[in-house]
A protein has these predicted regions:
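Alpha/beta-hydrolase fold nucleophile elbow
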Residues: 151-161
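Catalytic-loop region of hydrolases
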Residues: 21-109, 408-410, 417-430
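Bacterial Sec-dependent N-terminal signal peptides
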Residues: 1-25, 201-212
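C-terminal subdomain of alpha/beta-hydrolase-fold enzymes, centered on the catalytic histidine
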Residues: 263-430
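N-terminal cap/lid subdomain of alpha/beta-hydrolase-fold enzymes
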Residues: 55, 61-135, 339, 345-366, ...
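Alpha/beta-hydrolase active-site loop
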Residues: 130-149
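Gly/Ala-rich beta-loop-alpha elbow adjacent to hydrolase catalytic centers
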Residues: 159-163, 167, 171, 375
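Alpha/beta-hydrolase
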Residues: 10, 169-306
């Protein structure tokens, strides 16, 4: 009898533990929100107590009360309701819930938001008219409003590259949603294809390095027949479906090379092959700097929403063909507008970024900008006028992967001190 009783108590104990784990106080609160369509528990960083992948109902058109809806994916990593919240605005799909640098610095909770029209956050009927920075900012505002019911500490929004741009657009439309913004390597393009990119590529680094880049590009084009064969071999062996014919792809790779070289900073000037190197050496170097994926049908599909945004509102870049005109047979102008899907209508709104830029320069506050000095996107970085307390930090020689940890000494200390002052709290120094 006693054995049966002990067994029964053990079963109750196990059941109570299991129930408490699946029905934490946070989970109960999340389930009570009518805006949440789906919740799935996930593994998250060990410094967090709980982690969830959540689908949130959002209107396709926030300006229309009768709008159709879609579900937007977010990742929530929970530590403590009273701690700060780092609100990560992705520019594309969100495929991970890893803890960001900023969340470690602030010992913060974290929400990562997938951008509308990317990943799992795509409306059923793809209407490009509702892919705007304002509609995306409305998405973010709705999520902030919802989770501020739970998290009472300071809020900081942040993002990297296009995600950093998205951080700034969110702050522009809803300046009081967060206390501080930390956009990483976020360009503010002021034209459909911003000409400042050309000026940057003609002045970054040393003249010797820029000349070596150009000579490599010309050599790559000059060995067209051999390079084409190598490209075809890779396509066949890797079952790669390119978005264009082989000659167009190799020309496109050539034009993109200088932008990618400085953007990623993974190749040193001394590593660039000499013009008399074999076609195979030239080709392998090009692939390492310009992964073939970016020229495939799959990449065009994955990045289609970005190209729609770029050419309708947030801007992009083109190429200077003049150094290669005598070697090009497929590409007749330097525009990238051919990347936009045929289903999208292009009508560039030149005033959109002008308004954002003016606000960032004159009215914004508590924004910490992180840039890499050699990153091509630094060409169109925000230009502060000293009319607010925003801080722009540029890592000398830094590339598109520049972070707070990339800085040293007094520069890094200034970043930590500024964050601590704006948030009124002590911050971790990584």
């Amino acid at each position: 009898m006693r054995r049966c009783l002990n067994y029964f108590i053990l079963i109750l104990f196990i059941y109570s533990i299991s129930y408490s784990q699946t029905e934490s106080e946070l989970l109960k609160q999340l389930k009570s929100f009518r805006e949440i369509a789906e919740i799935k528990e996930i593994k998250t960083d060990t410094t967090y107590q709980e982690g969830y992948e959540i689908l949130i109902n959002q209107p396709v058109d926030h300006k229309n009360p009768k709008s159709k809806t879609f579900t937007q994916k977010i990742y929530l990593s929970h530590s403590d309701y009273s701690k700060p919240m780092v609100f990560v605005t992705e520019g594309y799909a969100a495929n991970r819930s890893s803890k960001t640098e900023l969340a470690r610095i602030l010992e913060a909770n974290q929400i990562i938001v997938e951008h509308r029209y990317f990943g799992k956050s795509v409306p059923e009927n793809l209407d490009w008219n509702y892919l705007t920075v304002e509609q995306a900012a409305n998405d973010h505002h709705e999520i902030v409003e919802l989770f501020k019911k739970l998290y009472i500490g300071k809020w900081v929004n942040t993002g990297v590259s296009k995600g950093g741009q998205t951080t700034l657009y969110h702050r522009y439309f809803y300046p009081h949603d967060v206390d501080v913004s930390v956009p990483y390597v976020a360009p503010i393009n002021l034209a459909q294809e911003d000409p400042r990119i050309y000026m940057f590529l003609n002045s970054v680094g040393t003249e010797e390095c820029r000349e070596k880049i150009k000579n490599f590009q010309r050599a790559f084009l000059s060995k067209r027949d051999e390079v084409r064969n190598l490209l075809m071999k890779d396509a066949e062996q890797g079952q790669i479906r390119f978005a264009w014919d082989y000659d167009f792809v190799l020309e496109y790779m050539t034009l993109e090379y200088s932008f990618a070289f400085w953007q990623w900073g993974q190749t040193k000037c001394e590593d660039i092959p000499e013009p008399d190197a074999s076609a195979e050496v030239l080709y392998n170097h090009m692939k390492a700097s310009n992964p073939l994926y970016f020229f495939t049908e799959q990449a065009m599909k994955d990045f289609a929403p970005f190209y729609v945004q770029a050419y309708n509102e947030i801007g992009y870049y083109g190429y200077d063909l003049s150094p290669f005109k005598d070697l090009l047979t497929e590409i007749e102008d330097g525009s990238n507008i051919m990347l936009v899907p045929e289903s999208a209508r292009i009508e560039y709104n030149c005033s959109s970024m002008q308004k954002v830029n003016k606000w960032l320069q004159k009215e914004a506050s508590n924004i910490l900008y992180i840039y890499g000095g050699n990153d091509t996107w630094n060409a169109t970085s925000v230009q502060l006028l000293g009319e607010n307390n925003s801080l722009k930090m540029v890592k000398k020689g830094g590339a598109h992967g520049t972070s707070i940890r990339s800085f040293d000494g007094e520069e890094k200390e200034l970043i930590y001190t500024t964050l601590g002052k704006w948030l009124g709290m002590k911050v971790n120094r990584l």
